[in-house]
């Protein structure tokens, strides 16, 4: 692997050209833009390894003179044992290449990756500033609540900002000092061959500061445990598996960082009569064979406030036929109208007949005509045709 080829630059490229090419390729292959893509992850590590060497004048001179396995390359060459296999190292190189653009609350990554850079710890927050953890709760709704929308009150446990120290963790301003070991950065940088390795400062735990006079209420944590009631407005049309995001209702952040979020996961109970399919409702309607033959008008249940609607069943309807009632289904959760009520007709054959009923049916059978049963007649015609062909 030639580092110049990896970055797509010539051997006489200036530091600015090398940096420009690296930044373009690193953004292209960054894992946040290519989730689950092993080839992109490999390329991201390769361009980071190449930039780590070519961006340093001393390493570049040694590489130009001796190649990857030069006398200053370390035990496994410039890339260590088998190259830059650690994604953390590659990401650190990436952050270093963009310099001050990580400031302003991570705005660079929010613009580049839609905020996904936070998953790799790329927020531009001060040392020790940690966003509060997000919380998740599950809520079960009745079928009717999901259809009409409802407000629920939830009891949520977590952490809130200490009101005594306002989240600083110290009893007074004088009770906080800059960490002497890391000089406020929260990290200790060590050189390993040609690479620089950063690790969390053991003195301050990565916060960049040391509390000498802790707050008595939160014991220096800046947060205290808390339980609170949260009102959640559930929109009409939700379904099982959906979730609602309530920004800022999670645990309080530390050292000025924002609070986490609250995720409400929805589960909807089954209904004894209706079945849901998207925004449509399915109702199984059993009817007798007389009603199926003669037709009828039937009051059927709905989820609307009226509770019932009148359905016309045409004469001669067959079992399995679906009748549509417009705009009597579930409301769309995004406010785009309602679904339909789909009534699936099931013609029930009578059972446990008395002798009188059986006799009436036998008399009826003597009056049957072929046009009364078009499917039956069509089937018999097919059978006749089949045996005629077979005989030939």
Curated annotation (Swiss-Prot):
- Write down how the cofactor binds this protein: Binds 2 Zn(2+) ions per monomer.
- Protein location: Cytoplasm
Q: Which cofactors are named for this entry?
A: Zn(2+)
Q: Which Pfam families has this protein been placed in?
A: DnaJ, DnaJ_C, DnaJ_CXXCXGXG
What GO molecular function annotations does the UniProt record carry, in alphabetical order?
A: ATP binding; heat shock protein binding; unfolded protein binding; zinc ion binding
Fetch the Gene3D superfamilies from UniProt: DnaJ domain (1.10.287.110), Heat shock protein DnaJ, cysteine-rich domain (2.10.230.10), Urease metallochaperone UreE, N-terminal domain (2.60.260.20)
Record domain J: where: 2-67
Residues reported to bind Zn(2+) 2:
179, 182, 201, 204
Q: Where are the zinc fingers (CR-type)?
A: 149-227
Coarse class of the protein's main subcellular location? cytoplasm
Q: Where are the CXXCXGXG motif repeats?
A: 162-169, 179-186, 201-208, 215-222
The answer to whether UniProt assigns keyword Cytoplasm to this entry is yes
Decide whether keyword Zinc-finger is in the record.
yes
Which keywords has UniProt assigned to this entry?
Answer: Chaperone, Cytoplasm, DNA replication, Metal-binding, Repeat, Stress response, Zinc, Zinc-finger
Q: What is known of its domains?
A: The J domain is necessary and sufficient to stimulate DnaK ATPase activity. Zinc center 1 plays an important role in the autonomous, DnaK-independent chaperone activity of DnaJ. Zinc center 2 is essential for interaction with DnaK and for DnaJ activity.
Annotated protein name in UniProt: Chaperone protein DnaJ
